Amino acid sequence: KYMGELNGHPLEDKRTEVISGDIFELVAQSNERFDAILLDVDNGPQAMTDAGNQRLYSTAGIMACRRALRKQGCLAVWSTKPNKTFERLLTGCGLKVRRYKVNAYPGNHSKSFFIWVAAEDENILPSDEDKWTPPRAKREGDNTPD
């Protein structure tokens, strides 16, 4: 319901192809290159409800996505909450990253969620700085990893 309203009902577009299967296998084995890969799998890179989804958020999964993208392509990853370890993984895989805090749809039990947008070329990342939430500054005595 909400995705169609937000995106101009892409499933009604004759150019849309829906593939049902394992996204890890698709990106790892595809000879095609994509303009965008959007991951809304499980609860994001933490709190898996299906342990099999974890490999998608591993170095191998992110590198498979990176290889499947066109040079000017971008990867977007939805999550229930921010995750510094995952942000470091994205940058460690050679991607430039911005994290956005986004409002949940009306009636959802959560007020907001997070989306990382990552690309090799920082210039193609969305520039809506109002929604960008930079990593929290480390405070004295804070032992939380950056």
Spans of features found by a protein language model:
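SAM/dcSAM-binding transferase cores
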Residues: 29, 34, 91, 98-146
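The AdoMet/dcAdoMet-binding core of the Class I SAM-like
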Residues: 1-69, 77-78, 93, 102, ...
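Glycine-centered, small-residue-biased loops immediately flanking beta-strands
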Residues: 73
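Short linear functional motifs in flexible/disordered or boundary regions
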Residues: 49, 77, 87-89, 109, ...
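Short, surface-exposed acidic/glycine-rich loop or hinge patches that mediate macromolecular interfaces
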Residues: 80-81, 105
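Short alpha-helix
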Residues: 81-93
